[in-house]
Amino acid sequence: MTRKYFGTDGVRGRVGDAPITPDFVMRLGHAAGKVLALGQKTSQGKPTVLIGKDTRISGYMLEAALEAGFTAAGVNVLLTGPLPTPGIAYLTRTLRLAAGVVISASHNPYYDNGIKFFSASGDKLPDDVESQIEAMVEEPMTCVHSDELGRARRIDDAAGRYIEFCKSTFPYEHDLHGLKIVVDCANGAAYHIAPHVFHELGAEVISIGNQPNGRNINAGYGATAPEKLIEAVKANGADLGLAFDGDADRLQVVDADGRLYNGDELLYLIVRDRQASGQRVEGAVGTLMTNMAVELALKRLGVSFVRAKVGDRYVLEELNRHHWQLGGEGSGHLLCLDRHTTGDGIVSALQVLAALRRSGKTLPQLLDGVSLFPQTLINVRVEKGFDWQNHAGLKAVRDRVEPELEGRGRVLIRASGTEPVVRVMVEAEQVETAERAAQELAAALRA
């Protein structure tokens, strides 16, 4: 079923343009209240949902719209103010609430925003539940009787509760004393959370990207723009740099030499540390874009590897299907289901730090078993509706190229979901091999 509003991570778009308007978001809150909450009345008679947000200026407007929609549906609302997305997942579960809602567009610029939902268990909603909400949005919005209206109030200790949870995922027998860490909060939801977590565990913390003004989220800072973090690590002689995105559900790491490590490498590191700690790791989940070197390295550790569609929600689905615990994406979404129900940048950083502390090794030493293959990506613009999957010339070139990689590389061809482009990606041990194969495949598409 094609969905009208929900994408891979909730409803998202440019603020002021449909669907990110106050009117639609109010109707969305009302619809979600009907679908998620009204079957879960509490001893007080009304279900309660939790609403958090990042630091975008539009968050005030959309928060008010959601509040109106939920309360009109007879649902009580708790407001946290700015809080990382995984913090909302955690509090929704531990406070025994009917649902959690996050107002954020993650790593996007400030003029975008979005709405995503968590179930009572702190999991992202499955596609079928989002489809139910979409169907309800199309129904006329009706307000419950005045006696049944919901109430709204702010929860004052949300940040403190979440900070303590994050710290609890770090091994008690270790601390961070003696480490100097630069923490880049992307001027986002972690600005008043992440520095405290690492400081309270003993680290010397240097914070950057921690002065949000409503319009500077992700602007030159954070996981999608690590240049300032690299500079700060070198300038301050820090041991490590940690970068989060606007809602702090993804992580990038920089070592003392300024080298950047992405989610693929960090997934391997966490798997290896779990094994070194005596934990059995049967398998891990990546995506179609996960570097093949990681897949091969995990197999050398005896760990099965499965690829999901791009998007952390699909990684989670595969983890649940196989009853595994560890997965992630190169973008820095890492799932450690033995620690949290969803991807969490701060918790992921603590798993990396735990590996460093337990092993006494550096990042390069812990990652000596994996060297990422060079990737070449070419975007080929095509006519709308172009049937690339049945393109005879492309098939002929692919049938010739793939055997030449000899199982030490791969070809991935897929259509963009947002523009008339076919993406051709080739991985190989040698950059020249990847570039040559990608050029040949792209030329076949253009012919």
UniProtKB/Swiss-Prot annotation:
Protein name per Swiss-Prot or TrEMBL: Phosphoglucosamine mutase
Organism phylogeny: Bacteria, Pseudomonadati, Pseudomonadota, Betaproteobacteria, Burkholderiales
Cofactor-binding details, from the entry: Binds 1 Mg(2+) ion per subunit.
InterPro entries linked to this entry: A-D-PHexomutase_a/b/a-I (IPR005844), A-D-PHexomutase_a/b/a-I/II/III (IPR016055), A-D-PHexomutase_a/b/a-II (IPR005845), A-D-PHexomutase_a/b/a-III (IPR005846), A-D-PHexomutase_C (IPR005843), A-D-PHexomutase_C_sf (IPR036900), A-D-PHexomutase_CS (IPR016066), Alpha-D-phosphohexomutase_SF (IPR005841)
Cystine pairs: none
Superkingdom of the organism of origin: Bacteria
Entry's Gene Ontology cellular component terms: cytosol
Residues recorded with modification Phosphoserine: S106
GO-annotated biological processes: carbohydrate metabolic process; peptidoglycan biosynthetic process; UDP-N-acetylglucosamine biosynthetic process
Cofactor(s), by name: Mg(2+)
Keyword tags: Isomerase, Magnesium, Metal-binding, Phosphoprotein
Name of the gene: glmM
EC number(s) recorded for this UniProt protein: 5.4.2.10
PTM comment, free text: Activated by phosphorylation.
Single GO MF annotation: phosphomannomutase activity
Pfam family for this entry, one: PGM_PMM_II
Enzyme class: isomerase
